[in-house]
């Protein structure tokens, strides 16, 4: 599309993309592999090679060196905020070289020395760029000092200038003043080059939102990726767009600018829900039971996102029973005989749930929701990235056995039988 519009492109094909995307772009099944991602481990690199066998051949014909519009290729993504294994970066580069990449490479990291040292390949003459959203003078000066340390007189570029920010559940929508943003962008372009992140807001469709790591609590991000960008989620110009346009006109009056295209959007009204059905009523039409002695995680059952229902039967040993879900993630709803008894979230999971036992044999259902895997930082390989129940469920002091497990990715509603009971 960019080529058709006469635009050049900078492509960032790393298997890790961050981008507030589920698991930073990695497939969930990698969590079953026992490998250390973003390292030089053979198992991981073999998977990257398989991925590049498909992806890179789609990129090669579009390189500038082949008459296309791709100017540069990124090696990894903010690797200096994760590791410092130079052999890994070289391996990623070599995998792309072996498959026909001929345009220049670059790296992008935070603009301070620690991340630049850890994540760059400056001694191999691979362009170093920085990611930031303000204080261009300070950040470019830091990058210049790093360049000088290595004897480089290189151009300065902010590869990700954060003109807005992503949003998380339970938090206020992040706002940024349009005029302040325009002045911050001016500070960048007077010293170097800029790539706005994001220029056009978007959507993390379905269950593909990412999650932020904060200590023992993870903070799921919302589905919208509007980001407060100059073009909003619908593709229409915002106040930021016009503020940037005005700044460019005042700073670079010779640059020709055109009025942006706009499109009509739908007025949001109440949308009535026509169909409804109980999950328990339609369970057998949307999923097949996987029988196991103990609960398995979502990943071990071959599922990546959505929900998973664990079902078993328990005997009445007392008028009230103490139940506990051991090592579950992210949100757990416990039902006894299809009646909700408790909802627990993240660190609450594992606390005692005292339930009345009305009959000799009781049906126990535990519905677990994957609310998004961490996409950035130190918890990419944490146990909490594995969703569902990791250890088991206890009644009194013993683990309950003999479970039916129902995978509920809910990627389609075609098999939902809405004629059944609500």
Regions found by a protein language model. Name each.
Residues 320-336, 364:
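Aromatic-lined ligand-binding clefts that engage carbohydrates, nucleic acids, or primary amines
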Residues 1, 30-50, 74-85, 127-136, ...:
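The substrate-binding groove and active-site-proximal loops of carbohydrate-active enzymes
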Residues 15-17, 28-33, 55-56, 232, ...:
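An acidic-aromatic loop/edge-strand motif
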